[in-house]
């Protein structure tokens, strides 16, 4: 299957989740993230604001804000994505593609102690990722390749075979955190 076919299949599957299933699975992802990443040691969490049937990132964002952990969320300008610090969710407004984006102007860049949370539609067991086709995260991480890169998704979004077509510009996360497991991609690829 090509990327387009895999995107379509996984979108249908993810969109079929009930609200209750999505809430439960998203909560488990949040708990697994807390078990895996020592957020107290993170200088800033770079995280997407969930949209439609994606894993709900609200609990992660709320937890970080409530615990004094710096939060940065993306805003797309043309073909470029930057991250902006937010202090609470009132600093978000509907932007590109109907996705909540920051209204603040405080751009921040990752450092060695940053945690970058990546979205995706499909992953294989080696961490190869199919996003939404814009390449925003691939470009951003290629330019600012610092910190720990973790993808979050529902477990059914992982294909056990290593079948995703890979391009030179594709970025692989260090780990994938799902509602039922944490995959150490860096270890599997070494």
Predicted regions and their residues:
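Surface-exposed, charge/polar-rich loops and edge strands
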Residues: 5, 12, 111-116, 125-128, ...
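A short, acidic beta-alpha loop adjacent to the nucleotide-sugar donor pocket found in many GT-B
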Residues: 122
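N-terminal active-site beta-alpha-beta segment that forms phosphate/nucleotide-binding
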Residues: 1-111
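Short polar/charged helix/loop
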Residues: 133
């Amino acid at each position: 299957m090509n990327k387009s076919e895999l995107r379509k299949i996984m979108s249908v599957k993810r969109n079929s989740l009930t609200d209750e299933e999505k809430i439960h699975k998203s909560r488990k992802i949040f708990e697994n993230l807390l078990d895996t990443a020592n957020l107290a040691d993170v200088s800033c969490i770079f995280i997407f604001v969930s949209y439609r049937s994606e894993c709900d990132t609200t609990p992660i964002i709320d937890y970080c804000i409530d615990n004094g952990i710096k939060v940065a969320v993306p805003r797309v300008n043309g073909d470029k994505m930057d991250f902006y610090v937010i202090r609470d969710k009132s600093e978000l407004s509907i932007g590109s593609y109907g996705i909540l984006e920051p209204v603040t102007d405080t751009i921040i860049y990752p450092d060695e102690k940053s945690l970058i949370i990546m979205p995706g539609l499909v992953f294989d067991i080696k961490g190869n990722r199919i996003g939404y086709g814009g390449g925003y995260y691939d470009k951003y991480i290629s330019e600012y390749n610092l910190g720990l890169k973790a993808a979050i998704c529902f477990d059914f979004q992982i294909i056990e075979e290593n079948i995703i077509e890979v391009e030179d510009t594709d970025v692989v996360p260090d780990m994938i955190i799902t509602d039922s497991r944490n995959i150490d991609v860096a270890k599997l690829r070494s």
